[in-house]
Amino acid sequence: YLYSSTLKDCDWAYIHEGEHPVVELPTEPGFDDFSFFYFSYADAHTITCSYPAEYVYNMWKDAFDELANEGDKIMCLKLHPQLIGRSGRIRMLERLVLYMRQNGAWIAGCEEVARYVLAQNGKEADADAVAK
């Protein structure tokens, strides 16, 4: 694999050294749209768990501001098209991305970030590394 987001132990990317280096990209449940927008009548625990898009925008914006203030941090949003893709939510995401870009963020996918981290550390991804 090229990268992993399983450990949830920090706010920056780092490399698992070894024969095949793997980049650890930070994540947390609060950056997963599923945590806020999943809803199912079949699951009693989720019937009231869908949050307003504005609430999520403010939470993610505040987190971005703090990470940007600290510097050298990464904010990996985990987004599901069937959740974030709803009309009000996708507009919220567009607004958030615009805000982040206006404040100096580099918006990239996990594979691009992982390859950047490897290059910055003088390493190359294995030719057969899978972006997962």
PLM region descriptions:
Residues 1-71, 121, 126, 131:
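Active-site-adjacent pocket scaffolds in enzyme catalytic domains
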Residues 57, 61-132:
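C-terminal domain-boundary segment and adjacent tail
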